Amino acid sequence: MEKLTILVLVATVLLAIQVLVQSDGEKPLKRRVKQYAAKRLSALMRGPRQCTPRNQRCEGDAECCPNLVCKCFTRPDCQSGYKCDTS
């Protein structure tokens, strides 16, 4: 009887450990979902992003409208500047 009691206790402890490990694995996923929701809400509150249209001056790809990149429009030194253009 004593061996059976010890076996039941060990099984209970192992089951409890398994439940704790599985529940910890879900926390990062929940955190990522909340972070995404917060970023999405923030973007919606800011409104549409203003972008630089084609053939307008730019300083980096991030400011150009979708499907455009910031390119040097004078070769070879690029001292005159950059413009948004197709890739």
Curated annotation (Swiss-Prot):
Processing and modification events after translation: Contains 4 disulfide bonds.
Transmembrane segments: none
Residues with the Pyrrolidone carboxylic acid modification: Q50
GO MF terms held by the record: ion channel inhibitor activity; toxin activity
Propeptide residue interval(s): 24-49
Keywords per UniProt: Disulfide bond, Pyrrolidone carboxylic acid, Secreted, Signal, Toxin
Tissue: Expressed by the venom duct.
Domain of life: Eukaryota
UniProt keyword Signal present: yes
Protein name (record): Conotoxin Bt15a
Phylogenetic placement of the source organism: Eukaryota, Metazoa, Spiralia, Lophotrochozoa, Mollusca
